[in-house]
From Swiss-Prot:
Protein name from the UniProt record: Small ribosomal subunit protein uS8
GO cellular component, one term: ribosome
Record keywords: Ribonucleoprotein, Ribosomal protein
UniProt record, GO biological process: translation
Source domain of life: Eukaryota
Signal peptide: none
Recorded family membership: Belongs to the universal ribosomal protein uS8 family.
Keyword Cell membrane: no
Length: 130
C-alpha cells in the first residue's frame, strides 16, 4: 500500500500510541520532513529521543514517548502563512496561548511558530502539537 502522506501517518501512529500509554512506537516509512518535525517536538520536550533505522527500504523510526503529548496532527493542504496571519492560525489550532506549537516549513528550515516569529519569516503550515 502506498502512503499518500507520510507525515500524517507518522503523527497518527504517535498520537495513537500516546493514547494507549505506550513507551515506544515504530514509524515506517520515514522521511526528512518527519525527522525534522520530531526534532521540533524533542526540542520542546513533548517526546523523548528517537532512532532512525535504515533498512534500505523506506526506513524506520523508533520514537520514545514520555507521556506529555495530548494531540498532534497535520494540516492538509499546506496553507501559506504570512507573518501577520500567524496569530490567527495559532488561535485556531491550539487550545491556549500558554502551550502547544504550530510547525511551519520556511526558507530557514522547519521550525515552530515562535521561532518563525522571532526570525520574522513566514512559510507553509505543516502541523501542530500540544
Amino acid at each position: 500500500m502506498v502512503r499518500m502522506n507520510v507525515l500524517a501517518a507518522a503523527l497518527r501512529c504517535i498520537c495513537n500510541a500516546e493514547k494507549r500509554c505506550k513507551r515506544q512506537v515504530l514509524i515506517r516509512p520515514c522521511s526528512k520532513v518527519t525527522i525534522k518535525f520530531l526534532m521540533v517536538m524533542i526540542k520542546h520536550g513533548y517526546i523523548g529521543e528517537f532512532e532512525v533505522v535504515d533498512d534500505h527500504r523506506g526506513g524506520k523510526i523508533i520514537v520514545n514517548l514520555n507521556g506529555r503529548l495530548n494531540k498532534c496532527g497535520v494540516i492538509s493542504p499546506r496553507f501559506d502563512v504570512p507573518i501577520n496571519d500567524m496569530e490567527k492560525w495559532t488561535s485556531n489550532l491550539l487550545p491556549s496561548r500558554q502551550f502547544g506549537y504550530v510547525v511551519l516549513t520556511t526558507s530557514g528550515g522547519i521550525m515552530d511558530h515562535e521561532e518563525a516569529r522571532r526570525k520574522h519569516v513566514g512559510g507553509k503550515i505543516l502541523g501542530f502539537f500540544f
